Swiss-Prot record:
Catalytic residue list: 149
Name the UniProt record assigns to this protein: N-acetyl-gamma-glutamyl-phosphate reductase
Enzyme Commission no: 1.2.1.38
InterPro entries: AGPR_AS, AGPR_type-1, NAD(P)-bd_dom_sf, NAGSA_dehydrogenase, Semialdehyde_DH_NAD-bd
Enzyme class: oxidoreductase
Gene for this chain: argC
Lineage, highest ranks first: Bacteria, Pseudomonadati, Pseudomonadota, Betaproteobacteria, Nitrosomonadales
Cell compartment(s), UniProt: Cytoplasm
One term of GO molecular function: NADP+ binding
Catalysed reaction equations from the record: N-acetyl-L-glutamate 5-semialdehyde + phosphate + NADP(+) = N-acetyl-L-glutamyl 5-phosphate + NADPH + H(+)
Assigned protein family: Belongs to the NAGSA dehydrogenase family. Type 1 subfamily.
Function: Catalyzes the NADPH-dependent reduction of N-acetyl-5-glutamyl phosphate to yield N-acetyl-L-glutamate 5-semialdehyde.
CC terms in the record's Gene Ontology section: cytoplasm
Keywords of this entry: Amino-acid biosynthesis, Arginine biosynthesis, Cytoplasm, NADP, Oxidoreductase
A GO BP annotation: L-arginine biosynthetic process
Length: 342
């Protein structure tokens, strides 16, 4: 069994981790921390976990992770980087679901996240946890930087075109939509029911924190810098990401064959039949990314549709997928949930 600790177990990502790991046949939850809920039973806070988890939340300043093999951080940005070094020094592996170790250029990270990085020496070591790209590196990693929700959907949508050198990489467009759970569980005006319901809006058009992460990943696949216009939107649904991606083709290519070939052996990327239009509900509660490719009127623009659940493939599910790879387990173990309908 893999003994697991979770730092920050009360947010939406944290409770999704709990839901998945409580059912994982090779994982045993040992420690779950929360500053505000220390001493509270996990199942008292989340009734969905009654009969599944009997642990209480622990004070993160008093907890001992010595019995853990791996620790997940489901914390706000800036927390993991303060604690990871000590855990690694004790032989404990870390999977960080925050953005602390995703961007390799520390100065760029500090610019986007507005704080000084306290563990820059670990940034180079951290492996970016997108299995469809870095599976072999993940196997031997001590520290995983779990990708963000938008970056997962956007990168998986663009990667086959980028790797094939089939598009103008200076004019990529990502028009993305997210459910309100992507904003987290904290109370904010823009996610109140009366604000988010019956409403649809764009935000962070001038620059979103996930932009440098996406650019970094796609540039690595290209071998040279790419340019991307990234516009996120908030939609009146709880969970889900829908990315509509546009790219100008530079040569003739069979998009359907390209995508089916690239993802043929990927257990969680589903390339839909030609002409399909994936729905966010088709991945709700699952670790799947479903993709459809289009070339309107056989023109020179490729339109790629990519959908994920922001809390699963965009966060907790992908983190557990990375854990499975790190420990040599079947990659699909514990994360084969069928999407919820209706």
């Amino acid at each position: 069994m893999i003994n697991v600790g979770i730092v920050g177990g009360t947010g939406y990502t944290g409770v999704e981790l709990l839901r998945i790991l409580a059912q994982h046949p090779k994982a045993k939850l040992k420690v779950i921390t929360s500053r505000q809920e220390a001493g509270t039973g996990v199942d008292d806070l989340f009734s969905s976990l009654r009969g599944q988890i009997t642990l209480k939340f622990s004070d993160p300043l008093k907890v001992d992770f010595g019995k853990c093999d791996v620790v997940f951080f489901a914390t706000p940005n800036g927390i993991a980087m303060q604690q990871v070094s000590a855990l690694l020094g004790s032989g404990i592996k870390v999977i960080d679901l925050s953005a602390d170790f995703r961007i390799k250029d520390v100065a760029e990270w500090e610019e986007w996240y507005g704080m000084s990085h306290t563990a820059p020496e670990l940034v180079a070591e951290a492996v970016y946890g997108l299995p469809e790209v870095n599976r072999e590196k993940i196997r031997n990693a001590r520290l995983i930087a779990n990708p963000g929700c938008y970056p997962t959907a956007v990168q998986l949508g663009f990667i086959p075109l980028i790797e094939a050198g089939a598009v103008d990489e200076n004019h990529l467009i990502a028009d993305t939509k997210s459910g309100v759970s992507g904003a987290g569980r904290k109370a904010e005006i823009h996610t109140l029911y009366a604000e988010a319901s019956d409403n649809f809006k764009s935000y962070a058009v001038a620059g979103h924190r996930h932009l440098p992460e996406i650019r970094q990943g796609l540039s690595e696949r290209s071998g040279k810098p790419i340019d991307l216009t990234f516009v996120p939107h908030l939609t009146p649904m709880i969970r889900g990401i829908h990315a509509t991606l546009y790219a100008r083709l530079t040569r003739d290519v069979d998009l359907q064959a390209l995508y089916e070939s690239r993802y043929a052996n990927e257990p969680f990327v589903d390339v839909l039949p030609a002409g399909s239009h994936p729905e966010t509900r088709s991945v709700r509660g699952s670790n799947f990314c479903r993709i459809a490719v289009h070339r309107p009127r056989n023109g020179d623009t490729a339109v790629i549709l990519s959908v994920t659940d922001n809390l699963v493939k965009g966060a907790a599910g992908q983190a557990v997928q990375n854990m499975n790879i790190m420990y040599g387990l079947p990659e699909k173990m514990g994360i084969q949930h069928i999407p919820l309908l209706p």
